[in-house]
Each structure stands twice: as C-alpha cells, then as structure tokens.
A protein has these predicted regions:
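N-terminal export/targeting leaders of redox proteins
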Residues: 2-113, 118-371
Length: 371
C-alpha cells in the first residue's frame, strides 16, 4: 500500500512543481529577429501576442486641424491674463493646444482639472502650476536632447496617454522595518518587483543613475582592486544595481540585452550597437528631468501628500515613463510636429495647411535589425 501511495504523491508533487516553475513563463509562440551575425545570440525575442496587445497603447491620438494663421492676429499673451509660457501663440493655436492637452492628460475631468471654474487666469490649483512647468520641460527636451529624441520630439501624450499622472513613474521605496537590525540591510534585494522585471535584484535601481550622478559600473576586470579613478564604483554591489537597472531598461523598451550590447562583450563600446549610444543619452535625459524639473522648485514643494511616495518624494521619470514597452515611444510617431507649443519658439515647425492626417494605429512593430 505504501509503495502505491508514495509514487502517486510523488507524481502529483512533481506536476505541481513543474506547474509552479512554468507559471512565470510566457506561453508561445516566440518570434526571434536576427540583429547580428548568425549563431552569436544577437537577436531579439518577441511574443506576437504581447506585441499586438500594445497596439492600442501606442496608437496616435486624434490630431486637431491646424489653426489658420493671420499676420495681424493677436497673441494669447495679448488677449488673456497670466499666460507665462505660451503667450506668443495665436489665440486660435493656443485654444487648439489647450483642447489637445485636455484630451491627452485629463479627458474625464476636462478644463477644470487645471483651471478654476469662472477664473481661468487663477493659479489657485496646483495642477495648473505643474502643467505650466511641464510645458517648459517638454520644450527643454525637444530643444536640448535631440540626441535621444531625434527630430521626432515628445508631447504631453508621450508620457500621459490619457492619464493625469503617467502610469510609469517611480518613488523611493519605503525602508523595511528591520532595516539596521542585527541581520543588516538587504539593499532592496530579494523582494522581486515589476520595476526590475521581477528579479531578486535591488528594487531601487533609479536613485543612483536617474537621480544621482553615478555612472554605471560593474565588477572589476582583475582579481585585485584596480587603482583607477572610478574603482570605488566597481564591485559586486554595484554590479547588482547595474543589472537591476538593465532589467528595467529591457522591460521598458520591450527588447533583449543585445538590442544595445554585443553578446561577446557587453562592456565594449566599439562592438556595441548604435542603440547603446542613444540609451546613454536617454539615461542622462531622465537624470536631467529628475534633477532640474521634477525634484526642483516649484514642483518639489507644490505637490500635495496624495501625489507623493511613501517617503514623501515626488514622482520621477524613468525609461518606461515614455517608452511604455515599445523600443520607440508611440513607435516613432511624429505627433509633436503638429503641435508648435511643445517646441521652443525658434524651433517650431510649420504645420501644413488643410485637414490633419488620420491617427495612425501602428502594426505590431519590432525593433529594426542592427546594421
């Protein structure tokens, strides 16, 4: 009897174990896309089902018809009160921009999400002060960080996608209760979370690289400590933080490590793909926004408690804030070229006359092959 019960229990246990091991895996099919010399692992692995599910998220919003330009038309700054950023726009273009930002950021709440009803000029709502600063931030990105955003540019919709608060922001994690006890502190490890692809790596891979000014470093290349200028940043602990951050980038862009790195030598820049340089600028772009806009006045002090993290810090950006699972936000949509307000005055594009183009719902777009 025992010989019969034991094998049966063993088989049931084995089936349960296999089920648990496979629960974290994506079900097929998988589609590899070669991005380098064959047989070297230089490829991207895509799941067509997941790619298709992202199509709606990365579809362009409706583009409003461009305002008709008149040389003698008064500007918004000459007509309305308390216009501090977009005052040089025509009244028609200013109204078009306000309509667009309402649809991009607060489609449910409408104009009163930022404005006081009956007194649109008032700065009484903190959201209006935030929106003004966000316009300055977007213009700064489009003017200064073309090495990352290229000539495509960004808009409010790039991050918000119809939500008043972007769905992918980060706060500093709360300190565990046993922090500083006899067992020491875990440095955020062994607490898998979505920010690091559910890995047991440090759960705050952003404070060092996207808020602080630290450079990415891994373990040293020799057995003994290297007498280099940046050697203090090399070691196992720094490697763990680096890999946590790399997991985030991979998940945020929906790509493998070899999208940026060469499989035979991850650290070698000469053998890396062109995307690695774009990512290098992207890291510094996010750091710039976090340091000089999101954690600086007036935003640092104006956000209420319900818009702050567990440690009281404000929301900050990372790679997923814009990319949201796509190797290019909105798969490279040129939405910004139809809205002059998101560019500084000297860089504003001319909007072609006539009806606007129909919104593009991009197909299941994969990252291109590396040349």
């Amino acid at each position: 009897m025992r010989e019969t019960v034991f094998p049966l229990a063993f088989r049931h246990g084995l089936v349960l174990l296999v089920g648990l091991l496979l629960a974290g895996c994506e079900r097929p099919p998988k589609e590899p896309v070669q991005g380098g010399y064959r047989g070297t692992g230089m490829e991207q692995i895509y799941n067509p089902r997941i790619i298709e599910s992202q199509a709606a998220l990365n579809a362009e919003p409706k583009i409003a018809r461009a305002a008709r330009l008149r040389k003698d038309a008064p500007t918004a700054g000459e007509t309305y009160e308390n216009i501090k950023v977009l005052g040089d726009l025509s009244i028609a273009e200013f109204g078009r921009t306000m309509t667009a930002i309402t649809a991009w950021v607060a489609p449910q709440a409408g104009c009163t999400y930022c404005h006081e009803e009956g007194n649109l000029a008032s700065d009484g709502k903190y959201t209006k002060v935030v929106a003004r600063r966000m316009f300055q931030m977007v213009q700064h990105m489009n003017a200064t960080w073309n090495k990352h955003v290229g000539n495509v540019g960004v808009t409010c919709y790039t991050c918000h996608r119809g939500h008043s608060v972007p769905q992918n922001v980060w706060y500093k994690p709360a300190t565990p209760r046993n922090e500083g006890a006899m067992t020491g502190q875990k440095d955020g490890q062994n607490a898998p979370g979505p920010l690091t692809g559910l890995a047991a790596l440090p759960n705050d891979p952003f404070s060092d690289y996207l808020l602080g000014g630290n450079n990415i470093r891994v373990q040293g290349k020799t057995a003994l400590r290297e007498a280099e200028l940046d050697a203090p940043r090399q070691g196992v602990k720094n490697t763990e933080h680096t890999y946590a951050f790399m997991m985030h980038i991979s998940k945020a862009l929906g790509v493998n490590c070899t999208f940026c790195h060469n499989s035979r030598s991850f650290q070698n820049w000469e053998q890396s793909t062109p995307q690695r340089l774009t990512a290098w600028h992207g890291i510094r772009l996010a750091r710039d926004l976090n340091q000089h806009f999101l954690t600086a006045d007036p935003l640092l002090t104006i956000f209420p408690a319900n818009r702050r993290g567990p440690l009281g810090d404000v929301a900050k950006v990372n790679c997923a804030t814009c990319h949201q699972g796509a190797y290019k936000p909105l798969y490279g949509s040129h939405l910004a070229s139809y809205y002059p307000a998101v560019w500084p005055k000297e860089l504003r594009p001319e909007i072609p006359p006539g009806p606007p183009p129909e919104p593009q719902t991009y197909p299941a777009v994969r990252a291109p092959r590396t040349q």
